[in-house]
Amino acid sequence: DYTKCKFSDGQDLQGSFLPNSNLSFASFIQVNLDKSIMMNSNLAFGTFSESSFIRANLYESTLTGANFEQSNFTSANLTRADFMGATLIDVNFQNSNLMEANFTSSNILNANFEGANLIGATWTNGEVCGPDSIGTCNK
C-alpha cells in the first residue's frame, strides 16, 4: 500500500510488477513505469505528470481524478481503465488499447489517440464510442 506516498521525481521503475497496488493520492512525477504490470491497481487522485507508461499493463485500473499531464501511454493496455475526472492534457495514447475505458468528465486537451482502440469507451460527455473507434471516438 503506497497511498499518499511522494516518490522522488524521475525514478526509473520500468518493468515493475505492481498488480492490485494502491497508489491513490501518490506522487510519481517524471517516473518511468514502461512495461510495468499494474493491472487492477488504484492510482486515483495521484500525480503522474510527465511520466511514462509505454507498453504498461493497467487493465481495469482506477485512475479517477489523477493528473497525467504530458504522460506517455504509447501501446499500453488500458482496457476498462477508469479515467473519470482525470487530467489528460498533452497525453500520448498512440496505439494503446482503451477498449471500454471510462473518460467521463475527464479534461482531455491536445491528447494523441492515433491508432488507439477506443471501441466501447465512454467519452467525456458520457457517450459510448462505436465499433469504428480507432484513433477517434466515433458514436
Describe these PLM feature segments.
Residues D1-K139:
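Tandem repeat scaffolds
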